[in-house]
Amino acid sequence: MKLILRRLFLWSWVLTLPLAITGGYLIVRTLDRFYTFQIRYDPRPINTTLGDNLRYEINHLLQTLRVKSTVRGIRQQTDLPRISLVVPEANLAQLRSHMPQSGFQYATGGIFIDGKLKKAKIKYRGDFSYHWRWDKKSIRVKTKKSALFEGLRVFNLQAPKNSKQLNNFLSLKLAKTFNLLAPRTELVRHYLNGTDRGIYFFVEQPSETTLRNANLMPGDIYRGEMVGKDKYSFLGLKSGDRRWLFDSASFWDKVAINNHYNPRSFAPLKKLIELTKAHKAEQSQAALSEIMDMEAWGRFSVFETLASTKHSSNSHNWRLYYDPWRGRLFPLVWDPAGWIWSPRPSGFPVISSDLHKLLFRNSDFLRARNNALKEFFRSGKDQGFLRLVSDSIKTMETEIQTDAFLRPADVTKVTNAMHKLQKQIQTTFATTKKHWIGNKISGARFHYHSAGLDLLVDGNRPVQAMRLMFDEKLADSITAKVHFETPGGKKVVDLPSGIIETDPNSIALYASFLPDLAIDYEARPLAELQVSPGYYQITFTGLNSDLRLTGLDIDRGDGWVPAQPGDSITPT
């Protein structure tokens, strides 16, 4: 027995030495990462503990060993497009010399384009530490003008932000589904100096090229950022003294310039900010409809709802394109980070900035938003996008098996998280559709008396047309006026003759009537849209007051549905 114990002791180094080396390696890497990104650099609001860093190092090492033990991992096989970068070790050392600051300076390297190595510049990118704290770092690549990569000079290789992996990729794909101005994005495999660095998201950097690829004329692209590296300090200021993006154009810059105008000119943006400050003034809404492409903004709002994103806020993440030929501002979707937050509950409008508050008081915007919802669900685009989600997850399930830099480094955990994301998207779509459509009844009530109609419009959708049916033949010439209350007082609108159609026994009004919408500015964390019935009085000229109304149908986009009569209708 003593002999056996002596021999075990003599050979114990075979076990203890590798464990000691591995433990020392993990401790050194953990302390170095924690010191670099948590002590020497202030990473707020994204903080990590020493334990978080140690767990990352252990899990990363285990994932690397798992990948290296598979044939597919050893052969670096992938079904994704490959983007191969080459950076000399000395230049990589320069990038990593004093992280994160050193990483934001371009280093010289190369990129393979059509099998040929072309010169390029590479740096790390991203406002927050999850982009560059870990081994899989987000990268920006800039090629020479004479050697574009798939038509682009500047693009990003973004590392996934969380265990769901696909949030940004899928939300940018959803933006494209809405025909919004958004950067191109693809799932790719990144190789650095011949080594597989795992799954990345190829994302175009917004520029004049983005406009050309969208068949838009060159124009200014304004960028609004006040967080991360662009953060302004308001220390010592009271909350009422702080300033945000829609307080001043001074907080904005340009990422694309119309060279027909002074590069320092921000006139369209300044006009928008003036209107935002006067958002409760009724006259500001007419001016807003003049400078904003409301069809695009309506689609953008629906996109925000379906992507459950509040990432465009008073301090962050705005990109606005100004088309000088049409004189309109368009949203450009950037870094939407979809389905990371869960607005209360999913499916409700997102009102996350002063610009949102202004838009949700604009009737042209509200009608455009309704049209965007109708087109998305009625065209089957929702089902097409859900198929894209399913296909993307299937691709990822194969690719993450050989991603040594997967974070979190747990294939099962990542797979479950992606399927959870899929269910979250399905739920958001279903909830939004149900909330928008409402119940099967018309959602409108009316009372007719003496050639006048009192109408109450309830629900979330506008009435797009109405048809009044009478028991006797009508006169050939009938006009109508609509009376309704606004925050600025009572308004009377003469309906154009072109939207009034008369048949022998009926009148059709092809006018839009909205429910009453108000914004609760005090709600937290986001302002809330409160919906109540809209009250309208319609008076007819040329209509015999003795005629009896036999019925009233309304159309909210589903065809004619009978409205409910009432003995009287009073404003709510």
Predicted regions and their residues:
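Middle-to-C-terminal accessory/interaction subdomains
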Residues: 32, 254, 260-313, 320, ...
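A conserved alpha-helical element in kinase catalytic cores
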Residues: 133, 159-182
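Internal "kinase-insert"/substrate-recognition segments embedded within catalytic cores
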Residues: 180-183, 196-299, 393
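Conserved oxyanion/phosphate-binding beta-strand-loop segments in alpha/beta enzyme cores
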Residues: 102-161
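Regulatory N- and C-terminal appendages and interdomain linkers associated
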Residues: 2-116, 383-572
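Surface-exposed patches in mature extracellular/periplasmic domains of secreted proteins
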Residues: 154, 180-191, 284-288, 318, ...
